[in-house]
Amino acid sequence: MKETIEFLIDTVEARQVLDSRGNPTVEAEVFLECGASGRAIVPSGASTGAHEAHELRDGGSKYMGKGVLNAVNKIHETISPALCGLSSLDQIAVDKLMIEIDGTPNKSNLGANSILAVSLATARASANALDIPLYRYLGDPLSNLLPVPLMNVINGGAHAPNSLDFQEFMLVPHGVNNFSESLRMGTEIFHSLKSLLDQKGLSTAVGDEGGFAPNLSSSEEAGDLLLEAIQKAGFKPGEQVSLALDAASTEFYSDGIYKYEGKSLNSSEMISYLSRLVSNYPIVSIEDGLAEDDWEGWSELNKELGNKVQLVGDDLFVTNTERLRKGIMEKSANSILIKVNQIGTLTETLEAIELAKMSGFTSVISHRSGETEDTTIADLSVATRSGQIKTGSLSRSERIAKYNRLLKIEEELGNQARFAGALGLGPKNI
């Protein structure tokens, strides 16, 4: 009786708000019969994969065409009436109904941004009604693993107005016993890096994800700076802190050629270059080392480096189980990046994580470059025991909000909390 009455969805409200880049995005609020409610705000990416679910934008002159009032109206006029009377506890039924109403392969009718906002808000409302944390609602009693953070402290590519082709150069602070110490380590290196950049007369302006965006001559120069910053902060590269890359190779790939740092490279040459980087730096993870549809190249990359480092498919898989299955069959990677707005519902996100886990792939829960104060991904990383999270650098409050949420979760868990880095989990070979 409690489920049939107290957890019934009463109504869904929505509004247009702004993300961290000043672009409109959707916030949804699900209200239950019992009086509980839950809110969620969806993020948006800058370097988006061609196979991602479709964001609904208004077009026209307002907000340079990026308004989302149409998506908000879809929630008010279509989604809310359809969900009224459903149990918020039946997340699968809620998400399935929205997918059925949309009726398109990529959610282009209702919009992935409107569907996702409602999907996440539904889970939040259920957790609030049960008076339990979201990570506990989405997970189980064993959901006590705090993730290793992959901290994007040097931004390039589509995330920054500088000369770097690779999009992210990340710190992976793993050689400590808990998340809070990992965060402290990353923060101290971040400030050490800022000091180094100042000393060298390089810009300390930050990019979309809070990392520095200096004009550097090469990825190697970025790697050298990170190693110097780690040592300057008093830590040991490779032993306590490793490195990770997001090449975002699709952004500089065309007609079978990678236009990288003024050179034209084929897939084999790009793989050889990545292999040299792995040999010369303590790199434990490479994301989107090749382009999203270079399947043959990905298989070769996995043969070359798959037993040495984590090879993460972001644009390659777009949190989509169909593309992930293809990658598993073709042995195209060994890890998947999880971005909830790439697929558009919580249910499909959890399905992708489960498929990855069953297939021996790791999962990295990730933010987007256009973020908000919403902290759902922090809870999701603990709920699913993914062991890894990407949520930006150590500046910009929309990034820090997720780190602060993880600190609170670790505090709530007390002596039950475990840290993936201390257990040798997270990226390969840490």
UniProtKB/Swiss-Prot annotation:
Keyword Iron attached: no
Entry keyword Hydrolase: no
Disulfide bonds: none
The enzyme's E.C. designation: 4.2.1.11
Catalytic reactions of this protein: (2R)-2-phosphoglycerate = phosphoenolpyruvate + H2O
Cofactor: binding details: Binds a second Mg(2+) ion via substrate during catalysis.
Record keywords: Cytoplasm, Glycolysis, Lyase, Magnesium, Metal-binding, Secreted
Pathway in which the depicted protein is active: Carbohydrate degradation; glycolysis; pyruvate from D-glyceraldehyde 3-phosphate: step 4/5
Alphabetized PROSITE patterns for the sequence: ENOLASE (PS00164)
Annotated binding of Mg(2+), by residue: 246, 287, 314
Locations listed in the record: Cytoplasm; Secreted; Cell surface
Listed cofactors: Mg(2+)
Catalytic residues identified in the record: 209 (proton donor), 339 (proton acceptor)
Regions that span the bilayer: none
UniProt family annotation: Belongs to the enolase family.
Functional summary from the UniProt entry: Catalyzes the reversible conversion of 2-phosphoglycerate (2-PG) into phosphoenolpyruvate (PEP). It is essential for the degradation of carbohydrates via glycolysis.
Stored HAMAP family: Enolase (MF_00318)
Protein name: Enolase
Species name: Prochlorococcus marinus (strain MIT 9301)
Organism placement in taxonomy: Bacteria, Bacillati, Cyanobacteriota, Cyanophyceae, Synechococcales
